[in-house]
Amino acid sequence: LASTAAPEAEPELLSAFFELCHRCLVFRPQLLLSLPCVASLFDAAAACVAHQEFQHTRAAITFLCLFLSGTDAANLYRESAAHCLQRSGGTLLRYCVQGLASASPANLVDHQIELLRVIAESAPTAVHGWLVAALADPGLDLGALPRQGAAAEAFVRGAAQQHATVAAFHCVASEFSRVCRGKAR
């Protein structure tokens, strides 16, 4: 995926690949999580998170959500996911924020919010720092949201705190996306 000049040029291939990876995690997690290239697989999926095409982006996000949250059958291999998140979690979160803010179509926002929630649950002590770094990155297009200011700070606080419900987290992240896209209420 990284060797091609345009990774989005083969959306059907990307969709099928990440759907296969997701099914491996569901039915035979040890097959996938014990591969020596698992970190490269994680990075390839992360790179697709802020793409424009719905199907393969959704497939990559669905794979990453299960990869990070795990299954009972994958418990023996959780260190693979933890290592990948420790190594590349900030980059994954940056792609996710980029997708929420402006890069991805609106029909992917709910999927990206779920990925952001899973990242926050999987790395609760790191997510605040990752968010601050992502929002400070001048290369990150935040659309209508000022890089510094009350709205950006509120998003970092809201997304990094432990939420009692999934709905509360969804509310914080969807409001961030609406503000960035110039659709705030």
Where do the PLM segments sit?
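Alpha-solenoid helical-repeat scaffold
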Residues: L1-R185
